[in-house]
């Protein structure tokens, strides 16, 4: 009996040891996987030193050809060992792929290497007014309403969902939410065909408007056709292409990035700043001058920011408060493999003056699931802390500079620690 119990004990013990070993390996594998980037960008004819200190090695291949290792190419090495510093140099644009192994044995992740020409952008850090028209009418809510007899109606509850976009009414494009409201009020209760877009699927639904208590025909939906606010312009290129915010325009009702048709940038004036405090984020408040000529056209709204064409004839608006006018000559960008923890600066506009303030980059997440939170930052500049309490709403898009290069842009503030926040890599913004 004792022998049998001892055998069971040994089996259980061995199983537990094996489980601990497996879990430990999975933890180590995942940890190393997250520390090695999935992509690396090199600028042509510039040495790049990579220091990851990981027990990972690999072979560099020409992209699309993984059968034969690269022997003679623009890149100076064909074997890499990420347990020590790796120096790469490329003489002309080309794409490569690194097939890696963990501990030199276990197949690991693939790393894409892109060799690109030098990129320069003009860091801005100036607040602008934003006005964007949705691509269709965004449905934010459906519900019931009563007619004059107290009978409840919900014409759209079963067929339309919050987050849907209404593109057409009876085959005709809708110009605005007022267009929809007036057309429904004049429909005399006849059934209506709505063209709906839902998660890239477009289809038609039939709905029958009903009268409300006032005798007006309604559908029982609440829609939006635009978004507006104040944000920070991150950069402008030499050709006038711009990026701003560092994150997309999000509708708070549906917590999703808006699909936009078009929009504009306008001049804005910050009238006041409410300092951030623990538990309460600060914010910039101001006015947008919609009546004046637009500064630029908004063309795209992505997860990483808003993008479009800036009117280069109106660069004086961006220059008026800029302390360092030499920034207009352009600045190189820092790719994520160049960025490191430590001192950096944020370029933002406070009291109509655009200047640098000190921050630190505390953590870098090379493979962040949320690209808007690829860096964790802390405001260390005493003057900025005295003026704003740290990061405030409206600063999203303020460019971050490290080692004389544009590294990223501010995106979020930590509500319980307003001196801390998150940022996006500038290379993520420049992909669009």
Q: Predicted regions span which residues?
A:
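Interdomain regulatory linker/hinge segments that flank or connect interaction modules
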Residues: 2, 14-18, 23, 27-29, ...
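Gram-positive cell-envelope targeting signals
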Residues: 1-56, 233, 418-432
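PDZ-domain C-terminal substructure recognizer with occasional recognition of PDZ-binding tails
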Residues: 100-118, 181-221
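Conserved PDZ fold ligand-binding element
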Residues: 69-77, 156-177, 400-403, 407-408, ...
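PDZ/PDZ-like domain micro-motif
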Residues: 144-165, 396
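Serine endopeptidase catalytic core focused on the charge-relay Asp
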Residues: 15, 210-389, 393, 402-403, ...
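Short extracytoplasmic
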Residues: 46-75
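PDZ domains, with a preference for the canonical peptide-binding region formed by the helix
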Residues: 82-93, 168-201, 417-419, 423-428
